[in-house]
């Protein structure tokens, strides 16, 4: 499986997700919603698995490879959110968010090889990346809910956001813990306040602040939605935005400095 074949798998997966989203929006033929969405996920994962086999390493090293996982998990998170709360529009927006990162990958192809630097040859590598990407996708759904709630002014969306943030921050915390164990093994320190690590803490603190504000239940709905949106933006900064900062050019977390 080569990167050149990604466009074929991506188009098929996006078409399936689009069919599922339209069926959900119309509120009819639930079997079509699940069949189309799951088919898209299967096609997308088939490409990831094919890359894994052909590269003889987990496709998690480059930024483009992590975007693959995010798009895949975004589809899963959107489907789970739809199953739980039955919002007809959630699959459309989750598919749209996944599509954004798929398009970035199509517009910015990478060179993929079998090399894997020593720091990435760790038992913590795969669980850290997958848990983090899944947490990002769940929090991506919370971002979608926050945007929708901000414009529709519905209280129920805030309760949905609560549940998504609780799950998302739980996985985010586990991902940070796995990352610290990995850092200890690879570089000798659990935490070094590297630029990426600093932004990880800022992101985590933003969602933790939301959780605490909800516990007191004295903060306005609009403020909470804005906080979720800002927290998601810091998450994007932590994921890839920090790579463009001058201070991050010597970061130990830049595994592929050409991407």
Task: Outline where the language-model segments fall.
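Polytopic transmembrane helical bundles with strong interfacial aromatic enrichment
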Residues: 1-259
């Amino acid at each position: 499986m080569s990167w050149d074949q990604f466009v074929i798998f991506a188009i098929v997966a996006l078409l399936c997700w689009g069919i599922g989203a339209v069926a959900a929006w119309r509120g009819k033929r639930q079997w079509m919603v699940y069949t189309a969405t799951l088919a898209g996920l299967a096609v997308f994962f088939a490409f990831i698995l094919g890359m894994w086999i052909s590269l003889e390493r987990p496709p998690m090293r480059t930024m483009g490879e992590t975007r693959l996982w995010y798009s895949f998990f975004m589809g899963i998170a959107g489907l789970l959110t739809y199953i739980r709360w039955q919002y007809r529009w959630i699959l459309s927006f989750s598919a749209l968010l996944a599509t954004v990162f798929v398009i970035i990958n199509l517009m910015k192809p990478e060179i993929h090889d079998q090399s894997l630097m020593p720091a990435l040859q760790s038992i913590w590598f795969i669980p850290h990346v997958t848990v983090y990407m899944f947490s990002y996708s769940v929090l991506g759904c919370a971002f979608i809910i926050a945007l929708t709630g901000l414009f529709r002014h519905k209280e129920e969306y805030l309760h949905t956001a609560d549940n998504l943030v609780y799950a998302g921050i739980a996985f985010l915390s586990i991902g940070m813990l796995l990352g610290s164990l990995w850092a200890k093994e690879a570089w000798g320190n659990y935490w070094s306040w590297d630029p990426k690590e600093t932004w990880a803490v800022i992101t985590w603190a933003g969602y933790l602040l939301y959780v605490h504000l909800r516990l007191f239940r004295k903060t306005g709905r609009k403020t909470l939605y804005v906080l979720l949106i800002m927290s998601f933006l810091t998450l994007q900064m932590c994921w890839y935005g920090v790579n463009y900062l001058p201070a991050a050019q010597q970061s130990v977390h830049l595994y592929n400095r050409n991407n």
